[in-house]
Amino acid sequence: AHESTLGNLFSDAYKWAVEQATGQTVDVALTAAGVIRETMPVGHVTVSDVFNAASLGVGTEGELIGVYITGADLMNALEVDSSVYPLMHSAQLFMSGVEYSYNTNRMIFNKVDYAMLRRADDSLEAIDKDKLYLVVTGMYAGQMLGSVEETSFGLLTITPRDAQGNPIAVEDLEDYVVYDEAGNPVKEWYAITSYLQQMDGTMEEQYGQVDSRKVIYESWNPAKLLRNANKFTYILLAVMLLLILLSALILRWIVKRIGRRKNAEQIKKEK
């Protein structure tokens, strides 16, 4: 897993385009590795380059959707990126509006040890697990995240919701496509193209390197292994403690049994 300049560009473009089209502030925008089909050339970028790099803009493919998720589910989305990615590379996520880090040595589904919302002015804001956040993504990534509960055997849930917090079925996500003022659906490739046009040639300056919105590292430091631990780490610790106690009890029983046998043999010799 890694932070990607192209992934950052795509997610930033989604956020910008939807805010322009709707006037709403988007909390987080995201895209998945499975959406990025090709790289884009250095220097002059054409609409065709963007169209080929992003999903096809046909039918419901490539349309941006806007849904709400809780802060707890946003954290679960980060765990999808850190824990599911090694098993399914297309699940790697790239986000705008959030910065986070994860330790690859931590417990699965608890690899993320730091996460904050990164606002437009670069200020940081804690993620409220009970609050609803407006999230923008493409249809492909939205459907993938909506089926996380099934693919993770119920261990992780990411429930798309409407503005009132009512759950949205995955098959109903098409009802939450983002439209501009003219009534046209906002496509991923169009969002990226429009974003690049308004940058006025500064893409290389802004996206020539990553900006540490996703930091991946490896450490066996106990403090870092337990930082912001969740239920999965606590369950693992409880199981490990139980195994240690059981091992100690079994060892104690074996020692006592050996001791009794030796005592019995000693008594027999004395007789």
Predicted segments, located by residue:
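Catalytic centers of hydrolytic enzymes
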Residues: A1-K271
